[in-house]
Amino acid sequence: KSLHPLYAASGEYDDDQLQSDEAKEFGCSPDFNAWTNGVNKKPEGTTTTLRSAGCHCHVGYDGKTAKRSRDIIKALDVFIGIPSVIIDTDTKRRSLYGKAGCFRHTMFGCEYRTPSGFFLSDPKLTEWLFGQIFEAINYLNEFGIEEINNDGTWIVETINSGNINEAKKIVEKYKINLKY
């Protein structure tokens, strides 16, 4: 057999592949929710054969603050998380990872953890993803965080439930380009 990479958001594995302690441990360190400012619950790796892959986005900036990082993550939810509901058809990953507002603080800024490995499946899609980071930052610079905060419940519920119809409404409101 020839080997080839698989770019997928999630996959089910046979029990015999998941017997080691390492295979049962999820998450190397805690991640946070930008919307609640709380720590996300770590998924339990011993109760499921589902495993997932992320395409985390790292954003660095000068004058790092926790609030600014949370604002960036919220904007990324609008410009990446919401479109991912429409573009990425894998709905299983969010049962483990990839919920709205998922991030880690870094030495240089923040790490957005919502996008899945699906975004690595096509170079044009990966390029679109990175372009959306700039769109989110440009939006924050021009309009601030207020409108996004006002839409917070709508954004979070849409991402976490995978509601495509609501995602399309948010895409229209924020004039998000889905072409890649």
Label every PLM stretch briefly.
Residues 1-180:
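Phosphate/nucleotide-binding catalytic core
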